[in-house]
Amino acid sequence: AGLQWLASWPWAVVFLPAAPLWAGVLALLGGGLLAMRLPWQLRLWSVPLLVPLLCWQAPRPAPGQFELLAPDIGQGNAVLVRTATHTLLYDAGPRFSRESDAGHRVLVPLLRALGERVDVLMLSHRDADHTGGAAAVLAQQPGAALTGSIEAEHALQGLRPATPCLAGQRWVWDGVAFEVLHPTGAEPDHPARPNTASCVLRVASAEGGPHAQAVALLVGDIEAAQEQALLARSAPVKADVLLVPHHGSKTSSSPAFLDAVQPRTALVQAGYRNRFGHPAPEVLQRYAQRQVPVVESARCGAAIWSSARPDVVECERDKGRRYWQHTVP
Protein backbone atom coordinates (compact mmCIF):
# COMPACT_ATOMS: atom_id res chain seq x y z
CA ALA A 1 0.00 0.00 0.00
CA GLY A 2 2.84 2.36 0.82
CA LEU A 3 4.50 1.80 -2.55
CA GLN A 4 1.20 2.35 -4.35
CA TRP A 5 0.74 5.61 -2.45
CA LEU A 6 4.21 6.79 -3.41
CA ALA A 7 3.62 5.75 -7.03
CA SER A 8 0.47 7.91 -7.12
CA TRP A 9 2.48 11.07 -6.48
CA PRO A 10 2.87 13.48 -9.42
CA TRP A 11 6.22 12.94 -11.16
CA ALA A 12 6.71 9.66 -9.27
CA VAL A 13 7.66 8.15 -12.62
CA VAL A 14 9.27 10.18 -15.39
CA PHE A 15 9.92 8.79 -18.87
CA LEU A 16 12.66 10.46 -20.88
CA PRO A 17 13.32 10.09 -24.62
CA ALA A 18 16.04 7.59 -25.45
CA ALA A 19 19.25 9.60 -25.83
CA PRO A 20 22.16 8.56 -28.09
CA LEU A 21 25.14 6.61 -26.78
CA TRP A 22 27.40 9.65 -26.41
CA ALA A 23 24.88 11.33 -24.09
CA GLY A 24 24.75 8.19 -21.95
CA VAL A 25 28.54 8.07 -21.70
CA LEU A 26 28.69 11.72 -20.63
CA ALA A 27 25.97 11.09 -18.04
CA LEU A 28 27.93 8.16 -16.58
CA LEU A 29 30.99 10.36 -16.27
CA GLY A 30 28.88 13.07 -14.68
CA GLY A 31 27.32 10.64 -12.23
CA GLY A 32 30.73 9.32 -11.26
CA LEU A 33 32.04 12.83 -10.73
CA LEU A 34 29.01 13.73 -8.63
CA ALA A 35 29.52 10.68 -6.39
CA MET A 36 33.20 11.32 -5.76
CA ARG A 37 34.40 12.88 -2.52
CA LEU A 38 35.50 16.14 -4.04
CA PRO A 39 34.91 19.78 -3.19
CA TRP A 40 31.45 20.86 -4.32
CA GLN A 41 32.98 23.38 -6.73
CA LEU A 42 34.50 20.48 -8.66
CA ARG A 43 31.40 18.30 -8.39
CA LEU A 44 29.33 21.06 -10.01
CA TRP A 45 31.11 20.18 -13.25
CA SER A 46 28.97 17.04 -13.35
CA VAL A 47 25.87 19.12 -14.17
CA PRO A 48 26.75 19.97 -17.81
CA LEU A 49 27.67 16.31 -18.31
CA LEU A 50 24.17 15.24 -17.22
CA VAL A 51 22.25 17.84 -19.25
CA PRO A 52 22.40 16.10 -22.69
CA LEU A 53 20.81 12.92 -21.28
CA LEU A 54 18.14 14.73 -19.26
CA CYS A 55 17.19 17.25 -21.96
CA TRP A 56 17.54 15.13 -25.10
CA GLN A 57 14.79 15.48 -27.71
CA ALA A 58 14.50 13.20 -30.73
CA PRO A 59 15.13 15.04 -34.04
CA ARG A 60 11.98 16.01 -35.90
CA PRO A 61 11.25 16.85 -39.55
CA ALA A 62 11.72 20.43 -40.71
CA PRO A 63 8.59 22.60 -41.15
CA GLY A 64 6.79 21.56 -44.32
CA GLN A 65 8.24 18.04 -44.20
CA PHE A 66 7.04 14.84 -42.55
CA GLU A 67 8.28 11.39 -41.64
CA LEU A 68 6.70 7.94 -41.58
CA LEU A 69 7.82 5.37 -39.04
CA ALA A 70 6.31 1.92 -39.60
CA PRO A 71 7.32 -0.30 -36.64
CA ASP A 72 7.45 -4.07 -36.91
CA ILE A 73 4.24 -4.94 -35.06
CA GLY A 74 3.60 -8.31 -36.72
CA GLN A 75 0.40 -9.01 -38.64
CA GLY A 76 -1.29 -5.62 -38.57
CA ASN A 77 -0.86 -1.93 -39.31
CA ALA A 78 0.57 0.92 -37.27
CA VAL A 79 2.30 3.92 -38.85
CA LEU A 80 3.57 6.97 -37.00
CA VAL A 81 3.34 10.21 -39.02
CA ARG A 82 5.52 13.00 -37.57
CA THR A 83 5.69 16.66 -38.61
CA ALA A 84 7.73 19.45 -37.02
CA THR A 85 5.46 19.72 -33.96
CA HIS A 86 2.62 17.20 -34.44
CA THR A 87 2.15 13.43 -34.48
CA LEU A 88 -0.55 11.16 -35.91
CA LEU A 89 -0.69 7.41 -35.32
CA TYR A 90 -2.44 5.55 -38.12
CA ASP A 91 -3.75 2.28 -36.66
CA ALA A 92 -2.52 0.60 -33.49
CA GLY A 93 -1.45 -2.90 -34.49
CA PRO A 94 -2.80 -6.31 -33.49
CA ARG A 95 -3.78 -8.00 -30.27
CA PHE A 96 -1.50 -10.99 -29.64
CA SER A 97 -3.40 -12.54 -26.73
CA ARG A 98 -5.75 -11.55 -23.92
CA GLU A 99 -2.77 -10.17 -21.98
CA SER A 100 -0.62 -8.80 -24.79
CA ASP A 101 -0.99 -6.45 -27.74
CA ALA A 102 1.09 -4.24 -30.03
CA GLY A 103 0.24 -1.19 -27.93
CA HIS A 104 1.81 -2.50 -24.73
CA ARG A 105 4.69 -4.33 -26.38
CA VAL A 106 5.71 -2.00 -29.23
CA LEU A 107 3.86 1.30 -29.59
CA VAL A 108 3.87 2.63 -26.02
CA PRO A 109 7.61 1.89 -25.55
CA LEU A 110 8.29 3.47 -28.96
CA LEU A 111 6.33 6.61 -28.14
CA ARG A 112 8.15 6.92 -24.82
CA ALA A 113 11.54 6.42 -26.44
CA LEU A 114 10.79 9.19 -28.94
CA GLY A 115 9.18 11.45 -26.36
CA GLU A 116 6.06 11.67 -28.53
CA ARG A 117 2.73 13.23 -27.69
CA VAL A 118 0.19 11.86 -30.15
CA ASP A 119 -2.30 14.45 -31.41
CA VAL A 120 -4.55 12.06 -33.34
CA LEU A 121 -5.01 8.29 -33.31
CA MET A 122 -6.71 7.27 -36.56
CA LEU A 123 -8.05 3.71 -36.69
CA SER A 124 -8.65 2.75 -40.30
CA HIS A 125 -11.37 0.23 -39.39
CA ARG A 126 -12.49 -2.01 -36.56
CA ASP A 127 -10.53 -5.22 -37.28
CA ALA A 128 -8.40 -6.37 -34.33
CA ASP A 129 -5.13 -6.28 -36.30
CA HIS A 130 -5.62 -2.51 -36.60
CA THR A 131 -7.22 -1.67 -33.23
CA GLY A 132 -5.59 -4.26 -30.93
CA GLY A 133 -3.14 -1.84 -29.34
CA ALA A 134 -5.42 1.21 -29.28
CA ALA A 135 -6.50 0.95 -25.63
CA ALA A 136 -2.89 0.93 -24.43
CA VAL A 137 -2.00 3.89 -26.63
CA LEU A 138 -5.02 5.89 -25.46
CA ALA A 139 -4.16 5.18 -21.82
CA GLN A 140 -0.61 6.45 -22.36
CA GLN A 141 -1.70 9.40 -24.53
CA PRO A 142 -4.55 11.16 -22.69
CA GLY A 143 -4.46 14.13 -25.05
CA ALA A 144 -4.85 12.14 -28.28
CA ALA A 145 -8.04 12.65 -30.28
CA LEU A 146 -9.60 9.44 -31.66
CA THR A 147 -10.95 9.16 -35.18
CA GLY A 148 -11.64 6.29 -37.56
CA SER A 149 -14.12 3.84 -39.02
CA ILE A 150 -15.37 2.21 -35.83
CA GLU A 151 -19.03 1.81 -34.95
CA ALA A 152 -20.70 3.75 -32.14
CA GLU A 153 -20.95 0.68 -29.88
CA HIS A 154 -17.29 -0.34 -30.27
CA ALA A 155 -15.57 -0.86 -26.91
CA LEU A 156 -13.01 1.85 -27.68
CA GLN A 157 -15.80 4.42 -27.80
CA GLY A 158 -16.13 3.91 -24.04
CA LEU A 159 -12.51 4.98 -23.56
CA ARG A 160 -12.70 8.03 -25.80
CA PRO A 161 -15.44 9.18 -28.21
CA ALA A 162 -14.34 8.71 -31.81
CA THR A 163 -15.00 11.07 -34.70
CA PRO A 164 -15.75 9.24 -37.98
CA CYS A 165 -13.19 9.68 -40.74
CA LEU A 166 -14.90 10.87 -43.92
CA ALA A 167 -13.71 11.82 -47.39
CA GLY A 168 -13.17 15.55 -47.63
CA GLN A 169 -11.75 16.06 -44.15
CA ARG A 170 -8.61 18.21 -44.41
CA TRP A 171 -6.17 19.88 -42.06
CA VAL A 172 -2.63 21.26 -42.15
CA TRP A 173 0.12 20.75 -39.57
CA ASP A 174 3.37 22.68 -39.91
CA GLY A 175 2.81 23.13 -43.64
CA VAL A 176 2.02 19.42 -44.19
CA ALA A 177 -1.42 18.74 -45.71
CA PHE A 178 -3.59 15.84 -44.52
CA GLU A 179 -6.68 14.70 -46.44
CA VAL A 180 -9.07 11.79 -45.94
CA LEU A 181 -10.06 10.22 -49.29
CA HIS A 182 -12.30 7.37 -48.09
CA PRO A 183 -14.92 6.41 -46.87
CA THR A 184 -17.51 8.76 -48.36
CA GLY A 185 -20.17 8.27 -45.69
CA ALA A 186 -22.45 6.37 -48.07
CA GLU A 187 -21.28 3.03 -46.66
CA PRO A 188 -23.52 1.17 -44.16
CA ASP A 189 -22.85 1.74 -40.45
CA HIS A 190 -22.06 -1.96 -39.98
CA PRO A 191 -20.54 -3.18 -43.26
CA ALA A 192 -20.34 -6.94 -43.71
CA ARG A 193 -16.65 -6.45 -44.55
CA PRO A 194 -15.12 -3.73 -42.33
CA ASN A 195 -12.20 -3.51 -44.77
CA THR A 196 -14.42 -1.66 -47.23
CA ALA A 197 -14.81 1.30 -44.86
CA SER A 198 -11.09 1.74 -44.20
CA CYS A 199 -9.90 5.31 -43.73
CA VAL A 200 -7.64 6.31 -46.62
CA LEU A 201 -5.29 9.13 -45.61
CA ARG A 202 -3.19 11.24 -47.98
CA VAL A 203 -0.28 13.17 -46.48
CA ALA A 204 1.61 15.72 -48.60
CA SER A 205 4.64 17.85 -47.80
CA ALA A 206 4.68 21.57 -48.55
CA GLU A 207 5.16 22.67 -52.14
CA GLY A 208 8.19 24.77 -53.01
CA GLY A 209 11.27 25.11 -50.88
CA PRO A 210 14.42 23.02 -51.23
CA HIS A 211 12.49 19.75 -51.71
CA ALA A 212 9.87 18.70 -54.24
CA GLN A 213 6.46 17.84 -52.82
CA ALA A 214 6.30 14.26 -51.56
CA VAL A 215 3.11 12.31 -50.85
CA ALA A 216 2.31 9.27 -48.71
CA LEU A 217 -0.87 7.21 -49.07
CA LEU A 218 -2.10 5.13 -46.12
CA VAL A 219 -4.98 2.93 -47.21
CA GLY A 220 -5.77 0.39 -44.48
CA ASP A 221 -7.42 -2.75 -45.83
CA ILE A 222 -9.30 -1.36 -48.83
CA GLU A 223 -9.99 -3.90 -51.54
CA ALA A 224 -10.20 -3.71 -55.32
CA ALA A 225 -13.74 -2.29 -55.30
CA GLN A 226 -12.71 0.63 -53.08
CA GLU A 227 -9.58 1.17 -55.16
CA GLN A 228 -11.79 1.43 -58.25
CA ALA A 229 -14.16 3.80 -56.45
CA LEU A 230 -11.27 6.12 -55.61
CA LEU A 231 -10.22 6.15 -59.26
CA ALA A 232 -13.80 6.75 -60.41
CA ARG A 233 -13.97 9.84 -58.17
CA SER A 234 -10.61 11.06 -59.50
CA ALA A 235 -9.24 11.07 -55.96
CA PRO A 236 -5.63 12.32 -55.75
CA VAL A 237 -4.03 8.93 -55.12
CA LYS A 238 -0.65 9.49 -56.82
CA ALA A 239 1.98 9.04 -54.13
CA ASP A 240 5.68 8.52 -53.54
CA VAL A 241 5.17 5.90 -50.85
CA LEU A 242 2.20 3.54 -50.52
CA LEU A 243 1.22 1.47 -47.51
CA VAL A 244 0.32 -1.68 -49.43
CA PRO A 245 -3.44 -2.30 -49.13
CA HIS A 246 -4.55 -5.15 -46.86
CA HIS A 247 -0.98 -6.26 -46.09
CA GLY A 248 -0.52 -7.44 -49.67
CA SER A 249 -3.68 -9.55 -49.91
CA LYS A 250 -4.90 -10.90 -53.25
CA THR A 251 -8.04 -8.80 -52.80
CA SER A 252 -6.17 -5.51 -53.23
CA SER A 253 -3.39 -3.75 -55.18
CA SER A 254 -5.29 -3.98 -58.45
CA PRO A 255 -3.25 -3.14 -61.58
CA ALA A 256 -5.30 -0.03 -62.35
CA PHE A 257 -4.81 1.28 -58.82
CA LEU A 258 -1.05 0.76 -58.90
CA ASP A 259 -0.87 2.47 -62.29
CA ALA A 260 -2.67 5.48 -60.82
CA VAL A 261 -0.66 5.68 -57.59
CA GLN A 262 2.72 5.19 -59.31
CA PRO A 263 4.55 4.70 -56.00
CA ARG A 264 8.31 4.92 -55.75
CA THR A 265 8.23 2.67 -52.70
CA ALA A 266 5.68 0.29 -51.18
CA LEU A 267 5.60 -0.66 -47.49
CA VAL A 268 4.11 -3.97 -46.33
CA GLN A 269 3.29 -4.55 -42.66
CA ALA A 270 2.73 -8.27 -42.25
CA GLY A 271 3.81 -10.93 -39.79
CA TYR A 272 6.74 -13.23 -40.53
CA ARG A 273 5.37 -16.43 -42.13
CA ASN A 274 1.82 -15.33 -41.31
CA ARG A 275 -1.01 -17.79 -41.89
CA PHE A 276 -2.62 -15.60 -44.56
CA GLY A 277 0.34 -15.75 -46.92
CA HIS A 278 0.69 -11.95 -46.97
CA PRO A 279 2.06 -10.47 -49.10
CA ALA A 280 0.73 -12.73 -51.86
CA PRO A 281 3.30 -13.69 -54.53
CA GLU A 282 1.06 -12.46 -57.36
CA VAL A 283 0.71 -9.09 -55.64
CA LEU A 284 4.46 -8.78 -55.23
CA GLN A 285 4.74 -9.61 -58.92
CA ARG A 286 2.50 -6.64 -59.81
CA TYR A 287 4.81 -4.29 -57.95
CA ALA A 288 7.88 -5.91 -59.50
CA GLN A 289 6.42 -5.48 -62.99
CA ARG A 290 6.19 -1.74 -62.26
CA GLN A 291 9.70 -1.65 -60.78
CA VAL A 292 8.38 -0.60 -57.38
CA PRO A 293 10.58 -1.80 -54.50
CA VAL A 294 8.56 -3.48 -51.73
CA VAL A 295 9.82 -3.09 -48.17
CA GLU A 296 8.45 -5.81 -45.85
CA SER A 297 8.40 -5.26 -42.10
CA ALA A 298 9.33 -8.90 -41.45
CA ARG A 299 12.66 -8.32 -43.20
CA CYS A 300 13.19 -4.61 -42.60
CA GLY A 301 12.07 -4.28 -39.00
CA ALA A 302 10.96 -0.71 -38.34
CA ALA A 303 10.93 1.25 -41.62
CA ILE A 304 11.58 5.00 -41.68
CA TRP A 305 10.70 7.16 -44.70
CA SER A 306 11.09 10.93 -44.97
CA SER A 307 9.46 13.33 -47.41
CA ALA A 308 12.82 15.12 -47.63
CA ARG A 309 14.36 11.92 -49.08
CA PRO A 310 11.46 10.16 -50.81
CA ASP A 311 13.66 7.58 -52.55
CA VAL A 312 15.16 6.24 -49.32
CA VAL A 313 13.72 3.83 -46.75
CA GLU A 314 15.84 3.13 -43.69
CA CYS A 315 15.47 -0.32 -42.15
CA GLU A 316 16.14 -0.60 -38.44
CA ARG A 317 17.18 -4.24 -38.90
CA ASP A 318 20.04 -2.99 -41.09
CA LYS A 319 20.90 0.14 -39.08
CA GLY A 320 20.86 -1.43 -35.65
CA ARG A 321 21.49 -5.11 -36.28
CA ARG A 322 22.59 -7.05 -33.20
CA TYR A 323 25.06 -9.91 -33.46
CA TRP A 324 22.46 -12.43 -32.27
CA GLN A 325 19.92 -11.52 -34.95
CA HIS A 326 19.55 -13.68 -38.03
CA THR A 327 18.87 -12.55 -41.57
CA VAL A 328 15.29 -13.32 -42.59
CA PRO A 329 15.32 -15.61 -45.66
Question: Where are the regions a protein language model picked out?
Answer:
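Transmembrane helix-bundle segments that form internal channels/tunnels in multi-pass membrane proteins
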Residues: 1-69, 265, 286-296, 302-318, ...
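Conserved beta-strand hairpin/beta-sheet module of binuclear metal-dependent hydrolase folds
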Residues: 63-109, 113, 194-223
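Pre-active-site segment of Zn-dependent metallo-hydrolases
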Residues: 87-126, 222-237, 320-329
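Binuclear metal-ion centers of metallo-dependent hydrolases, dominated by the metallo-beta-lactamase
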Residues: 145, 149-175, 179, 184, ...
